[in-house]
Regions:
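Helix-to-loop junction immediately C-terminal to a conserved catalytic motif
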Residues: 388
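The feature captures the beta-strand-to-loop junction immediately N-terminal to the Walker
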Residues: 373-375
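Conserved ABC transporter NBD signature motif
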Residues: 396-404, 416
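Transmembrane alpha-helices and adjacent helix-loop boundaries
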Residues: 1-325
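Conserved Walker
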Residues: 381-382
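ABC-family P-loop ATPase nucleotide-binding domains
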Residues: 431-461
Length: 461
């Protein structure tokens, strides 16, 4: 994670410089300017998908649905409202992004029930449902779609043609910076822990379900923003433009560029944009060309184009400490004296007809070390699972510092100060030693997703 973020931070200014140089070159070439504009639009949507796929390990083949929500919101509202051009587009865009975010929250909640290819199929179904709604809704123009969408306007400046290139890439780079803020903060560490080992993350205090939903909502918001810009700059939206093929194209951008960061999404979108410029030479075999390209990348560079760059940024050793650490220990809030730290009462766990734990009761005294001893198969791990929230109880209750935690999720139990290890070590294999240690402090950090997004001081605590 550290090497990935460092590579992202150093690559992003280089990509910004390339955008500027290409923009200067495209000043006299409308085809280049238009291709660059749409590359920026798709890059915004790809950034969200890259976070979802590469950092949270949640695949989505329905991003075109969010893209379409943003596009149709802008198309429908700007053509229906009798508002000044400088006001209608920002307001319609905000509404479209908000709707896409809320739909992302809902899809994220539903997606908690699915994993692997089942999740891919569920998100694919979402995308197909959205296309069906767009196609059949008379209010949205049906199969014809909505046309005559006004260009964004700020004062006397109309954002179309060549100015649209700079506007689109400005928003794309802002989206990249905001996403990089998230990945550098507490939320980014939570995402990475979930990707490496979801159960280990949960027992360390990471609310994995909540962060998965956050990831879906954020990716939906960025896709909605991309769709809003697409509608405004193209001037027309039809259902076929936001079909499953677009979802696959966005996934292709992430695979080619490299998932798990922002630079890879920008690179992937630029590569596809370049191919589209020269695509007239293989218009009838585009899918074949894209397929061969993906196969080549998977074989030669599994991490995508950015993975090759990232491989040069290995984790660096920590600098030697130049000032002595404060020897004073941090004050620890102790529970109320007359409340037992842990009380287990009549805990029973059955697996069908097999009784793994039978009517176990004990109370731990403060300041003592207690051992649970038994042969293999005696139910020790099952009891630990019951106490830590990993496994559901059949009967009985567990109290921690006077609070009944029976049936609680593991991250809520961890928030009360109960930690656990596993019989087999569960390390976050793609994180450094320091990052593994820092992950254990997640429950005592106080930053939020919004604070990480805006890089507020609490996100650096």
């Amino acid at each position: 994670l550290n090497a990935r973020l460092r590579a992202d931070g150093r690559t992003l200014p280089i990509l910004a410089a390339i955008v500027v140089v290409f923009g200067i070159i495209a000043a006299g070439n409308p085809t280049f300017a238009q291709a660059g504009t749409y590359a920026a639009i798709f890059a915004i949507a790809a950034i969200g998908l890259s976070l979802l796929l590469g950092n949270v390990n949640q695949i989505s083949i329905g991003q075109a649905g969010f893209f379409g929500i943003g596009a149709y919101a802008v198309a429908g509202l700007t053509t229906a409202w009798n508002l000044p051009a400088w006001l209608s587009w920002p307001l319609a865009t905000a509404i479209g992004v908000l709707i896409a975010t809320l739909v992302g929250l809902g899809l994220g909640f539903i997606a908690l029930r699915f994993r692997g290819h089942y999740l891919a199929m569920a998100t694919l179904a979402f995308g197909l449902i959205c296309v069906g709604i767009f196609h059949e809704s008379k209010a949205l123009g049906g199969a014809i779609g909505i046309e005559d969408i006004p260009y964004p306007q700020f004062g006397v400046l109309t954002i179309s043609g060549y100015p649209a290139y700079w506007f689109a890439w400005a928003l794309a780079l802002i989206a990249a910076l905001l996403t990089l803020n998230v990945l550098r903060g507490r939320s980014g560490r939570a995402f990475e822990a979930i990707r490496n080992d979801e159960l280990a993350a949960e027992v360390l205090g990471v609310p994995t379900r909540r962060y998965k939903i956050f990831a879906f909502a954020y990716s939906g918001a960025l896709a909605g923003l991309g769709g809003a810009m697409y509608a405004a700059f193209l001037g027309i939206v039809v259902p076929d433009a936001v079909s499953v093929q677009l979802s696959i194209s966005l996934l292709l951008m992430v695979v080619l560029g490299g998932s798990g960061g922002v630079s890879g999404a920008l690179i992937g979108a630029a590569l596809i944009g370049f191919l589209d410029i020269s695509g007239h030479q293989f218009e009838n075999s585009r899918e074949v060309v894209y397929g061969l390209l993906v196969i080549g990348v998977v074989i030669a560079a599994p991490g995508g184009a950015f993975g090759v760059i990232r491989s040069r940024f290995k984790a660096q050793p920590l600098p030697a400490r130049t000032t002595p650490a404060n020897a004073a220990p941090r004050a620890i809030a102790m529970p109320v004296a007359d409340v037992a730290p842990l009380a287990v009462a009549h805990v029973t766990k059955r697996f069908g007809g097999l009784v793994a734990v039978n009517d176990v009761s004990f109370t731990l005294a403060r300041g003592t070390l207690t051992s649970l001893i038994g042969p293999n198969g005696a139910g020790k791990t099952t009891l630990f699972n019951a106490i830590s929230g990993v496994g559901r109880l059949t009967e009985g209750s567990v109290q921690i510092a006077g609070s009944d935690v029976t049936g609680w999720q593991p991250h809520r139990v961890a928030a009360l100060g109960v930690g656990r290890t596993f019989q087999n070590a569960r390390l976050f294999g793609e994180m450094t030693v320091l990052e593994n240690v820092v992950a254990g402090a997640f429950r005592i950090e106080r930053s939020s997703f919004a604070a990480d997004l805006l890089a507020l001081p609490s996100s650096r605590a």
